[in-house]
Structures are given as structure tokens and as C-alpha cells.
């Protein structure tokens, strides 16, 4: 009998992979058995992730799907879109629990992959089996899930901000705008012109402003909750932080509501959720990703401008945690029957 | 006969005051004759503004309204709201040209001061005489203007983003949201809990999210252009930059429009405007305040998400320049019959 | 029999206090029983430390020394210099273990308090009893210590960089310069002109450059190791980070030494030290505080310029962790007979 | 007769090239006639430098040395080391004034190129003709100079900090350490792993710490001033700013000197220098690059720790201005008989 679940991290040299390692290295019920990287195979993991010096002594290996089941019981795929889908069927056949952090299994409707991702999905049947790994919405389904499609970060921020609103149907259902501000780690570990420090620092730069892909999964999830077709436009902006994403979800109230009523609807919706914190205070009245850095929390709050019936809900996350690796481990924990917060009792840094 | 117009800067120790000095010290047609500061009277200006070491040898003085006309022909008031209004009438009587950078003369309707600023305006007649100092909208009125009410920075960003849209009536007129992201210099030179570096850096922090005051002047100006009542909600967010403000003005198109048509409407609206640059490109497709830092430019651009008829117009400014001191000098230049860009041929820094 | 040691944090609203709480809230063998703040007494701790929302439900209280022994077994004093010394004698009499994070008990020679801190030390006998809380140098003395004087951050960085060098006597003993670069959190939570975000961000600002106080404790500790009088000049510089301190300790080799020999001397000196990591690599060849953020690690490395016999040793710490709260808990753990890393198995964030 | 000197900028797409354009576009006596870029030939300059939108309408071209004399009277070479040297002889033959911003003509001793730059210099005779373009040291030689070797940024900062010290021989001549802190723009416009925003922001990262190349030119210039062999070790550190370099030059006084005497020696050395500002004040007592951003100023100051005879001189520059493009234009102005500050009356931004 094994003491610990052996986990593999595929794509371990990127930021999401690195964040998975940061979490899993102190997870009480897992043992990191394999860390793959095509680019750095054979090199020490801590060479690429100097934060892990002295904590992980493994080297990166090439990903060998044939031997993976000898070494791992569960596998996290931190790979680009369009790559994971080639591995998932076999990994499932081998009996591994698969947590995929790409978009490859997030959408239920295969047609949407053509529209938003420019490819024909080769395994549409797996889309039905995959569970969208947002535990606040899919807790029960995640139990014993074998294929978890971990949400995108801007989608997570947007969905968490809007879910209580669409569930309670207090706003115009066709006019949701999620204006998202994100740190630079969201773009991954690969350098580019736009991520070059002198270009990226001090930028307040809209990007993918004409139709951000995460709208597809956000609409899927919000429509499910609303039991209606929800349209949402996500407009992301690169700002100077490294970690953090704030969604400012602007909507229009259809009826007058007191603030306390809105507060109650949101609080009720998220009652008992381990990683949701509802913000309402006088010193720090709104969510700010600064206060969740390093943790799996999502802070949710709102503001109303009554004279024109504008409601904005805010959600603040650490894009690498609740927006990626943290949420993946949270969903994994549920699927394995662990405590939801195993490995995730990480307290946000302050100041950071 | 004087060679140069003598100008006084009242409230010269703050950031807006300092930025006026940075501009005026190389302005070809002005001479800085008086710089006041209650707090630093008697001390060298360059003690507080070390960037001006070797460039300005004046000391700060106390503001003495009785003697000001001996020393200055024009005066810039960089004072808090509710202070300038006490000085303006006398300064006008003394024959000075007054450029007020506070909100005290921006609104035409005195009732709005009660609602938005919590005071009864003591000189409602002056509100009629004051010219709202946004030269792109009020060029003709600014000629020979004696009292210029220089716009707020978030208002400037919002108005410049939305003016061509409301002028051409292509969107829903009741649902404008200007989601603004601003640098820390917008809060002024006085330290506070929220501006403390460890608190402010990496923040993505909504503030005044339930009714930002600049909405009042933005609605006034946009309604004038639209010849209709325009409602706009301004939701500002503090981000990590020092300088820069980006307004992302989200609206809903009422008719299908090709991008080129939208581009033409915006370009036509701003044709010939010295400090407006229309952005449409493949490497940097949208405005970013990063590319106007240190200059008086406002970069304007847009994005359309056709499937849901969402139009976002962006405007990017340096909040201390086009959002404050630069715009004030631009309006002053017009009022004095100078070239619109005297003292303002400042090229944006890159990278910055 | 108590399950957990009850700990009080006095001065809990500052950054060091907050960092102690971040650590102690997940410490397996302690229970936070009292958190004091003169300024915020009666208010929820999470109001001031929003990162701790949902994690700590205590309110701040006023510090009442008379009742403290009913509530706490150990006490952390996160107070300004000159304040702790008034409380320590009574707290010791009451039987509490005292961990003082101020400078009040760091120096053995009471004369030095007059020179460096401008006060006459009222309890010179306690200076003998206090243990300087740098576990890498005082591990044995810390066992059962009742009064721990936790080191200053710039002193910690300087001592850790130079200890192996002075121990092995390979350099000129009179010419040590520790050029330190530090983040803004080192200045504490109280806003000031210099910490105002627009002033502090992008600063590369020398401060206390004519005799930094931490030299006193660094010289005390380094002289003890060297068994000789060591002089060291600490020249700190404020840079843009929030967390992190790097000491670049410049020295002059008295004999030619191969790099491998220097490496061995440093590695030998720190053999078996839980929180020291010796850095020597090709991608990240020198220590950088970036890779220890959020953790108690100190990364140590060096560079030699042979042609002129210059040796620089570098040490990188998180100033709030190994430079303050983390080191305090580390020393506390040793004094209590706990594992040295209880509560400190915190993995550095990356990227951060 | 030409009204303006026609200038070409070769390598116009990088940061130094861009900064030259920012300066030259408002220079009263030059006309930018050619801007070359191998990578972007045919594309608008403002596509790569969005700050220059509306200010420069030229496209980049390929560099054609044969036709350059038809189009330009002077040429700025903003090219990598080892490239300029191939063009310079022909350009000089063609009668152009050549300002080279690489290291290719900075060193007088050709042997040093083998040691520090790993190449044999093909035109050692030109090294004699080239003038090291630091106007504070070579003003007279720069008049009518045809080949100007513009200094490196870390060398400029180091030389300016140490020149008055070595000239007056008040310190140990063998033990100079210039601990330099620099912003990210110093690394140029090309992205790399180390310049990736999530890696570079918040870094306090030593680099080239075992023998920085700029020591060669610094030692050449300082030895010339001292009329003695000066050794200096330059240890650069990457910090979070975009622009700015601070050299903290640590030295050991050989005699006791009052601060006022040191101040006088420095002030005397730099008397009448247009771009040098000597810093001595109570609010901002030391130089900080923050206060020269965007300008050609170098701020010089110092600190003494008398008890151990340590003297640190500081120099603060904008690495793209006084450290590169600004200084190049300053030297060019002198060579052409223009005012030293033509095009350089740029006031530092504050805050920035």
C-alpha cells in the first residue's frame, strides 16, 4: 500500500508547472515522482526554478507516456493548448487521474473549439467526461473525476465575479463586460517582445481586446448557472504586477436593490466555500489581488452606482494560484477524496 | 514692453505644480516669476523638486494676492478643490489670466457642486464665464479666455475616449462605462496609507467605485457634444505605474459598423488636433499610456467585439501632462494667442 | 498540559508583526493568543492585514503587561527601538520567553548604545543574558534562551555574507564594505515622504550612508567569529522591490585563492544549516532576493575579480523573513526545542 | 548652404537609437535624414517607437555605406560591439563626423581589446584619432573631432563619481569599487530570459560580477586624470527601474578630511560643467537617478564614514541619456561648434 499518491507534472519548467511544484512539494498526501520538460530534460529542476533549490532534487525528464503509469498515479498537464488533448485518452486508459491546465477539455460544445481555438476537437466524447475544474461550481462532479479541465485565469476571475449575479438574475443578461487587469506572469515563462521588462513595466496595455478566448468558457459556465444564454465580453489589460488578476465585471441592474441585498445574494451563493472571501470593509473596501498573492483565495466584492443602476462586481485572484495551479490542486484534492485545502494552506504574503 | 508673459504658479510644491514648472521653465514666451507654497515658503524650489536643480533658482513664497499683479500677468492655481474659488474673483479683477487646475470652475450647473463636491458654489456667475479647458472641444472659446477651468485627468481620459462616439451617436447612450487605470502620481504628492510604497506597488485597486466625481464634468461635456443627456460611470483603478491613465470606455453599438467606419468617425472628429494621435497598428494596436509619458499627447484607439456589439474606445494620457499641467499650458497658450504647443514640444520617453 | 505554546505578538499591526502572524497562523506548535496594537486596539486584525481575512478572527488589543502571563507563554516584541527594553525585564520575571525584534538587546557592549542609538541602556546586565538570534552563529546558546535579540535585516544580510570570510581570514580585515540594496517594506508600515509611491518607485537611493547603525551588531558578530576587531561599513540603498535585501560585501583577498577553494570555505562554514543555500550555477550564478521571497532562506554566493584581488560575497534574504519575522521564529523554535523549521516550511514564490 | 546638419542614425530600432531620435527630433541644428535598421527596413520608424508617432514620418532603411555621404553629414552608430569598427574608416574617408556608441574606439591601447572584448582591433591607428566622448574630461579635444567614441553607461557613472577623487589623490589608489545599480533599459531592446518581465521585475541581481568590461575604459580615463595607474572594480546589479544608473564608488581616505573640503574638491573639479550637478542637501542628500530621468544631467554627491575613513562618491545618470544618447549628442554638439546643450535642454521628469 502506498502512503502517498505519486504525481507527475508534465511541462514543469513553465510558471504554472513551477507553481504546481511549489504547492506539491509540501502537500501532505502527494509525492512528486516525475517532472518533465522537453527543453530542460536531464537538468536539475532547481536550475530553472531557483526558488526550489534544496527542496526538489529531481531532474527534468522527457515525457514518456508509455512508462508514466509505472511512476505516477495522477498527472498534471501544464502544456500549451492543442497538446494535452493528444495525451489525455491514453493517460485515462492507463488509469491515471488527469488534471489538464490547458483549454483542451474546458468546453462542452466541440463546435466552439473551431470558433475560438481554430482546431477540430479529436475527442468530443471526452468533453462530456471532463469536469470543469472550478470547485465552487462543480464540487460534486469533481468527486472521483478522472479528467479535470482546469479553468483559465481570466475565465476564473470573470466567472467568480459574475456567477452570483447571473444566478440571481438581477441584471441585464446581455451586457456583461469583464474588464480584467492582469500581471505579467499570466503570459508564461517564455520571453517575447511584449514581455521584455522595459516594454512591460509601466504598461497599461489592452490585449486580445476584440474577443478574448476565455469568454467561451465563461459564457458556458455562466449560462449553465443562469439557465439562460449569457453573453460576456472579456477585455484584458496587462498592468505592471507580476502576479494577480482583477476582474471588474460591469453590469446594469434591472431593479433597484440595496447594497445589503446584493451582499446577501453574493454571500449566500458562496456560503461555505473554502477559498472565497467576501469583501466589504472600510479600509480596503474592494478586492485587490495584492491581498491574495501566493494563496488560493478569491476575494469577491462589489460597488453600485445607484443613480445609473450600474453594478460592478470585482474578483481578485493570484493568476498562478486560483487562476491556475492552486485551483488545479484544489480540484485534484476533491477528486482524490483529500481535504480540499491539502497543500493549499498557503497564507497570502503582505506586503507583496 | 515686456518680452515674456510673467506667470505665477500657486501651489508649486505638489506634482501638478512641479509639472507646470517643468513645462514653463523651457516655455519660449513665459517667465516664471512667482512660485508659492504655504508649506515650503522661503525654501528653494529645487529642494522639493530635485529634478529642477540648476534650472530654477527661485524660492517658494507665500501667496500674497494683493501684490500678485505687480509680479505676474497670468496665474496657474494648482490648489485643492474649494480653495481656488476664493481667489479667482479678485485675480480676475486684477486683470490676470487665471488657469485653475481644481474642479472649482469646471461645472456649469451650480447645483452639481452640492451633489458631487458637497459645497454651495459662491460664484455661480463665474461658472458661465469660465471655459472648460479641453482645447479639443473648446478651442474657439479659449481664445482670450480669462478664466480657464482645467479638466480632471480621469475626466479628460474619459471624454477624449467617448467624444467621437457620442458625437456620432453609434451606441447606446445610457450605458457608458469608463473603466480607468491610473498611476500613483494622480493622487498627488501628499503621503497616505494607500500611497505607501509597499501598499501601492502591485496594487490593482478599485477606488471611488460607487460614483467618481469626474463623471459630473464628463457627462456635462459629452451631453453638450451629443446634444442629449449622456450618462457615464467612471470606475477608476489604481495600478502600479507612477504616470499614466488609460480609459477603457465600454459601450454597446446600436448598429453594425465596420471597423474602418468607426476609425473614420474618430479620425474625422479629431482631424487637425495637435495632441491627438489615432492608434491603429499591428505591433501596438491599442493606446498605452507608456507611449505618451512626459508629453501632452492623448492616444486614442478602439476595439470591437462584433458577435456581441461591444465597442471599447481607449484613451491613453500622461495624467500629469494631458491630464493636468500640460493641458493647462495648452489652454493657456490658446488664450494668450501663442502657438498651441509652445513649451509642449516634449517628446514622450521610451522606454519609461 | 497544554497542547500548544500560546504566543503573543506585541506591535501586531506593522509589517514585522503581520509577518509573524502569517507564519504563526500555520505553525504546528503555537497558538496565537494575543495581538496588540495601540493604534488599532478593538479592531479586527484582518482589517489591517487583509491577507489574513478568514484566517485570524482576533481583534487587536492594548498591551497589558500585567495580564500577559495569563494569556501567553512566549511573546514577540515587534516594537520600535527604545520601547522593548522597558518591557523585557518584567516579561522575563513573569516567566515568558521573550523574542525582541528591536535593537534593544542586540549589542553586548552598553557603550555602543550611546554611540549608535543615542540612549543609555538601562539594563546592561540583560545584554549579557540576551542571545543574538542568528541561529547559524548561536544555535547552542539559543537552546532554552529566555531573551532572544533578533538581528536587524541589513545586519543579517551583511553578517551572513561575511561570516565565512572573516572566519577563514582570507581578506583584508579593515576594509569591508557591505553595499546593501533593500526593498521598501524594510522601512515599516508607516507612510512617509520617502515611502510615498511616486517617490519610492524607481528610486535607487542611498540612505544612512554615513554610518548605518546595523554596522554595530555586524562588527560585534564578525569580530567574535574572527577573534579580531573587524570593521565594516554598511551602505544601504533603497531600490524598487517591496521585499528583499541583497548585501554585496566587497573585500580584498590577501592571498590568491582559486574559486573552488573559496566555495569550499563558505560551504564548510554553513554545512548543515537548514536555511542557508550556497549558490553557484550557470543560469543564476549569484544570489538574488527574488528567489527567496516569502521564505526564510538566505542564499549565499560570491564573485572574484582575480586581476585586482577583489572578492565580493553576496547574501540574499527576504527582509521580513530571514531579515525579521522568519528568523525570529527560527530562533524561537530552537529555544523551545521545536524543529528549527516549524512554521517555516514556506517555499519561496516564483515569479514574485 | 545648408541650414541644418543632416544626421543619420544607424541602428535606429534599439533603445539607444530611439533615444537619439527623441533628442534629435527637436534639435535646433540637425535634420534626421536617415534611420537604418536591418530588421525593420521598410517599416515606419513610429511602428517600433510608438512614442514618436506623429513626430517622425521616415521609414527605416537598410544601411548603405556607399550612398550615405549623399544623405548625411554626420552619423551616429548605435551598433553592437565589433560592428562599428568595420564602418568607421570608410565613413571618415567620406568626410562624415562619426559618433560611435559602441566600445570599438574607446580604448587607446589595442591590447586591451583582446583582453576585454576578445578581438584583435583591426584599426589601431584610429584608436589614437578617436576622442573619448566624455565632455567633462575631453572638451577641448572634442572640438572638431571627427571620430567620437561615446562612453559606456556604467563607465560614465563610475568615471564621473571617481574623477574628482583620483584627481585630488585623497584616497587609496588601488582599492576602488564601483557598485553600480542599473535599470533594465541598459540591456537593450532585445528580449532575453533575464529581461522577461516576471524575471526582471523585483530582481536585485548581480551580473558580470567577476570583471565588468567597462572597467577597462574607466581605468584608462581615471589613470589619465590621476597620472598614475588606477585600478577599479565595477560590480553591476540589475534593479527594477527601467531607466537610471547609480554608481556607489567606495574608496578609503588616506587622510582625514572634513566634508566641506571634499565638497570643495568635487565642486572645483566640475566647475562650469553644464550637465553636472553637485548634490548636498537635507531632504535628498545623495544623488538618485530618479531625479535625472529623461535628461542629460549627472548628479554627483558623496558620503563619508569618518570612524573608518570610508568615502563613497555617488553618481546618478539616466543610462540612455548621459549614459548613452544624450552624452553622444553633447559630444557631437561640441565637435560641430554648436551649443553644448542644443537638443539637450530636457528637464528631468518628476515623479517618474
Swiss-Prot record, chains A, B, C, D:
Phylogenetic placement of the source organism: Archaea, Thermoproteota, Thermoprotei, Sulfolobales, Sulfolobaceae
Pathway the protein acts in: Amino-acid biosynthesis; L-lysine biosynthesis via AAA pathway; L-lysine from L-alpha-aminoadipate (Thermus route): step 3/5; Amino-acid biosynthesis; L-arginine biosynthesis
Organism: Saccharolobus solfataricus (strain ATCC 35092 / DSM 1617 / JCM 11322 / P2) (Sulfolobus solfataricus)
Single GO biological process annotation from the record: lysine biosynthetic process via aminoadipic acid
Places the protein is found: Cytoplasm
Protein name stated in the entry: [LysW]-L-2-aminoadipate/[LysW]-L-glutamate phosphate reductase
Active-site residues, Swiss-Prot/TrEMBL: 153
GO molecular function, one term: NAD binding
Enzyme kind, highest EC tier: oxidoreductase
Keywords for this protein: Amino-acid biosynthesis, Arginine biosynthesis, Cytoplasm, Lysine biosynthesis, NADP, Oxidoreductase
Catalytic activity, EC: 1.2.1.103, 1.2.1.106
Function: Involved in both the arginine and lysine biosynthetic pathways.
Stated family: Belongs to the NAGSA dehydrogenase family. Type 1 subfamily. LysY sub-subfamily.
Secretion signal, residue range per the UniProt entry: none
Protein origin, superkingdom: Archaea
Positions annotated to bind NADP(+): 13-16, 319
CC annotations in GO: cytoplasm
Catalyzed chemical reaction(s): [amino-group carrier protein]-C-terminal-N-(1-carboxy-5-oxopentan-1-yl)-L-glutamine + phosphate + NADP(+) = [amino-group carrier protein]-C-terminal-N-(1-carboxy-5-phosphooxy-5-oxopentan-1-yl)-L-glutamine + NADPH + H(+); [amino-group carrier protein]-C-terminal-gamma-(L-glutamyl-5-semialdehyde)-L-glutamate + phosphate + NADP(+) = [amino-group carrier protein]-C-terminal-gamma-(5-phospho-L-glutamyl)-L-glutamate + NADPH + H(+)
Amino acid at each position: 500500500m502506498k502512503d502517498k499518491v505519486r504525481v507527475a507534472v508534465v511541462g514543469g519548467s513553465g510558471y504554472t508547472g513551477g507553481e504546481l511544484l511549489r504547492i506539491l512539494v509540501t502537500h501532505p498526501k502527494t509525492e512528486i515522482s516525475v517532472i518533465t520538460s522537453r527543453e530542460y530534460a536531464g537538468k536539475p529542476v532547481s536550475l530553472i526554478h531557483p526558488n526550489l533549490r534544496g527542496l526538489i532534487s529531481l531532474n527534468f525528464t522527457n515525457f514518456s507516456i508509455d512508462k508514466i503509469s509505472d511512476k505516477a498515479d495522477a498527472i498534471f498537464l501544464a502544456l500549451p493548448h492543442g497538446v494535452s488533448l493528444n495525451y489525455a485518452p491514453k493517460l485515462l486508459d492507463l488509469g491515471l487521474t488527469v488534471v489538464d491546465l490547458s483549454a483542451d477539455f474546458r468546453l462542452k460544445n466541440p463546435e466552439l473549439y473551431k470558433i475560438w481555438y481554430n482546431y477540430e476537437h479529436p475527442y468530443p466524447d471526452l468533453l462530456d467526461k471532463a469536469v470543469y475544474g472550478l470547485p465552487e461550481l462543480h464540487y460534486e462532479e469533481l468527486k472521483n473525476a478522472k479528467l479535470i479541465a482546469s479553468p483559465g485565469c481570466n475565465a476564473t476571475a470573470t466567472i467568480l465575479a459574475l456567477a452570483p449575479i447571473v444566478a440571481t438574475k438581477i441584471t441585464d443578461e446581455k451586457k456583461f463586460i469583464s474588464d480584467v487587469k492582469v500581471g505579467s506572469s499570466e503570459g508564461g515563462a517564455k520571453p517575447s517582445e511584449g514581455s521584455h521588462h522595459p516594454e512591460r513595466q509601466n504598461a497599461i496595455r489592452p490585449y486580445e481586446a476584440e474577443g478574448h478566448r476565455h469568454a467561451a468558457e465563461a459564457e458556458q459556465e455562466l449560462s449553465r448557472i443562469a439557465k439562460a444564454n449569457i453573453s460576456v465580453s472579456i477585455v484584458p489589460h496587462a498592468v505592471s504586477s507580476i502576479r494577480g488578476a482583477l476582474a471588474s465585471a460591469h453590469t446594469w441592474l434591472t431593479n433597484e436593490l440595496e447594497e445589503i441585498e446584493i451582499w446577501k445574494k453574493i454571500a449566500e451563493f458562496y456560503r461555505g466555500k473554502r477559498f472565497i472571501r467576501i469583501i466589504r470593509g472600510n479600509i480596503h473596501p474592494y478586492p485587490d489581488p495584492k491581498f491574495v498573492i501566493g494563496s488560493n483565495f478569491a476575494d469577491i466584492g462589489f460597488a453600485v452606482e445607484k443613480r445609473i443602476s450600474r453594478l460592478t462586481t470585482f474578483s481578485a485572484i493570484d493568476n498562478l494560484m486560483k487562476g491556475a495551479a492552486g485551483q488545479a490542486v484544489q480540484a485534484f484534492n476533491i477528486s482524490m477524496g483529500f481535504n480540499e485545502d491539502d497543500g493549499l494552506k498557503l497564507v497570502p504574503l503582505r506586503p507583496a
